[in-house]
């Protein structure tokens, strides 16, 4: 199976998000890469489901709370930008202050 670099990146994000999801379910607080991966994967999946950019920008702020992440992580993440594939093409989704 041949994958493009973009497809490999998507799989890497998905794998990291899956790990983050499992750790969150166990009650573990997420670190920086896990938090970014979980938010990014949720945005990409939402785009695949047909949500709009505006909906995903709002949705991105509901995925994690300060209680879900290690101390200081919320302050480190000011924006998350994800190139997501929508039915009408690829668009950049920016989620400002995603962890509230």
UniProtKB/Swiss-Prot annotation:
GO molecular function, one term: nickel cation binding
Chief location category: cytoplasm
InterPro entries: Urease_gamma, Urease_gamma/gamma-beta_su, Urease_gamma_sf, Urease_subunit
Catalytic activities: urea + 2 H2O + H(+) = hydrogencarbonate + 2 NH4(+)
Protein location: Cytoplasm
Annotated family: Belongs to the urease gamma subunit family.
Organism, as annotated: Teredinibacter turnerae (strain ATCC 39867 / T7901)
Protein name: Urease subunit gamma
Pathway involvement of the protein, from the record: Nitrogen metabolism; urea degradation; CO(2) and NH(3) from urea (urease route): step 1/1
Summary of subunit composition and partner proteins: Heterotrimer of UreA (gamma), UreB (beta) and UreC (alpha) subunits. Three heterotrimers associate to form the active enzyme.
This protein's GO CC annotations: cytoplasm
Alphabetical UniProt keywords: Cytoplasm, Hydrolase
Gene Ontology biological process terms, A to Z: urea catabolic process
EC number, as in UniProt: 3.5.1.5
Keyword Transmembrane attributed: no
Statement: the UniProt record of this protein carries the keyword Cytoplasm: yes
HAMAP family in alphabetical order: Urease_gamma
């Amino acid at each position: 199976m041949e994958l493009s670099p973009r497809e490999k990146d998507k799989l890497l994000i998905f794998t990291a998000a899956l790990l983050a999801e499992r750790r969150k379910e166990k009650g573990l607080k997420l670190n920086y890469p896990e938090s970014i991966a979980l938010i990014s994967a949720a945005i990409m999946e939402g785009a695949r489901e047909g949500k709009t950019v505006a909906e995903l920008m709002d949705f991105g702020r509901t995925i994690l709370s300060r209680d879900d992440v290690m101390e200081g992580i919320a302050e480190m993440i000011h924006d998350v930008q994800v190139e997501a594939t929508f039915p009408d093409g690829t668009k950049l989704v920016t989620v400002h202050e995603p962890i509230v």
